[in-house]
Amino acid sequence: MHDANIKRYCADSVQLWTGGSRGLLTRESASRVKVITENHISSQRQGYICSDNIHVLHDNPFDVAKRHIGSGKTAVVHFLDPKDISGGCMAGRASRQAVMCARSNMYPCMDSANVREGFVTYSKYQFHSYDSDRLVYIPAVTVYRDAMLNVMQEKDWFSVDMIAAPVPYMPGGQSSEAYFNAKVLMAVYKSRFKNIFEAALSESVNNIVFDDMGCDENMCPPALIAIALREAIKEGGYAGMFWQIICAVDEPYSQCMTGKMSIAGRFEDAFFRTETSREYIRRMESMPYTPPKETLEIIDGPILGDASRIERFVRWRAGNRYFGKQFSILGDGISTLAGFNPPGYEVYYTGDNCNKCGVYHMKDTWWGRLIDYYGGHLLVNNSWKGSMVTYDRCGSRKDYSAGCSKERTIHLHVGSVEPDVIIIYMGINDWKQGAYAERPMYDRVSEGLAEELIFDSAANIMVDRISRRYPRAEIWKCGLIGTYVRSDPSFRLSKNKNGINWCKYNGGYYRAGHFANVAFNEPIPGYYSIDGIHPNVEGMQKFAKMVVHGFDYLFEPERFAKYIDEKYDIVEDLDYDQYCKVLNEDVQNRYEQTKPYSYLT
């Protein structure tokens, strides 16, 4: 819906429902608002004999609720962005949440310290974009406008309870590049639906009305949400605990992007079919796949114009042991990308840095190429710009940003979905800041330092915490490598300000547990960078290639030759401060000048 008056309508609602006698009604409702935590279990288990009480309607949830008010306590379930409970209505954004705020006093009822602290602020500190299962129960929300936003006669106003649930945004979804992981979304929605039903039971709700559940603005596949809801109802036995369970998932502006079928039509079709969540996930994984150029660039040899070899790669990919597996990343700024990292984390690849490096999409990054190469799925990218494996001795960074911290090592999963592979690439900032690579002998300064301040000890703590929390996951530890820039490849960066070579830090990784160590055994290891550390798009390609070579689980291994870069005469190693002074700022990004490939014949 696009309405230039949405801001005025919402402002009118706030003014109408915060003053006078109507303000008393709002404050009374707000005083009874509850924040319901995750994994809520109701002590009430009401039972009804209902043979046909689940419906999918092409209608507005408020209007559906109005028709059922006389037949028991009714609640409308609304999925919203917990970081903006107004839905942008005060800024004039025409979202579903904004429309509901314009039609009722829902926003003034939710605008309380209890909700801001226990729901809004809490959501800002989640470690992934799917958010939590926390809910807000809002009693007696008054609806006074109709679906066309016209003020109804006061005798037609009505009150209905509401349950606000966080919409699970897909990674990259808020930066226009949504990444779809069917297994994760299915698990997240099922868990959220169960918490909603338990909350409704605790409040003695008889009729429960769902809105679009996030498949409108979030554009999550309606079929997936329908299957998740159906299985949640079946597993919890909720069909016999409510008089009516209604899905009102269609409004005039809730249309499929293709225009072929409404969201409600696709939802209804999937809801009343027999396809299970496992069958749906398998069907998604078996969809036709065309490898992007960025993935094919990992493979040695002339493959971009070789259709038969591309076909062989697609078959190998579908049968390799990592196909369909869940990958999590633990890294620093090199592994960040706008929209793909936890809320509140500092990100390097965003805005102007993306323009400088030519890294805009997941398929441009080293980890995106690698995951697609093996046919896996991104689970969590827990990467933070500037973070180190160790605690910061200087105190300029909080301890919880360190790779060895408990906060980062236990947040590599989403709900019930655990990682199959965890890839660690960190340490460049430890090297840059001059952290102790190992505890030196006869050094009084280092004698009293905590283990978390010494790199090899911190790396061991990090890997140990990860392996204890995720005992079934493979852990791939990537060693540090040098870098160079295309404008002057003779400059090599390998020593920090204390004169310590980055190779010293790799020793700490290799001693940290018996897990897969990805060693870069290249003749001239390194990648193209924009500033001596952060790779540009060509550097991302080389980096992904080196990880695959280092892990040595390859497509057509007999045809893989070690990636031999051009030979350069290496000048004396420079420390980071010297390097920054002599760095040629006129770095040309060859990616922007290269014509698109036509790799399929």
What are these regions, as identified by a protein language model?
Residues 1-208, 212-295:
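Macrodomain-like recognition of ADP-ribose-binding/processing modules
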Residues 337-440, 444, 448, 486, ...:
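Conserved SGNH/GDSL esterase-like catalytic core that processes O-acyl groups on lipids
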Residues 242-243, 376, 470-475:
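A short helix->loop->beta-strand "cap" motif at the edges of active sites that frequently abuts
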Residues 279, 287-362, 372-373, 417, ...:
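N-terminal secretory targeting modules
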Residues 480-601:
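Catalytic His-Asp segment of secreted/periplasmic serine-dependent ester chemistry enzymes
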Residues 76-78, 162, 209, 326-330, ...:
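Structural recognition of the beta-strand scaffold that forms the well-ordered cores
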Residues 222-230, 455-460, 492-497:
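Charged helix-capping and loop-helix junction motifs
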Residues 425-432, 460-496:
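Active-site segments of SGNH/GDSL-like serine hydrolases
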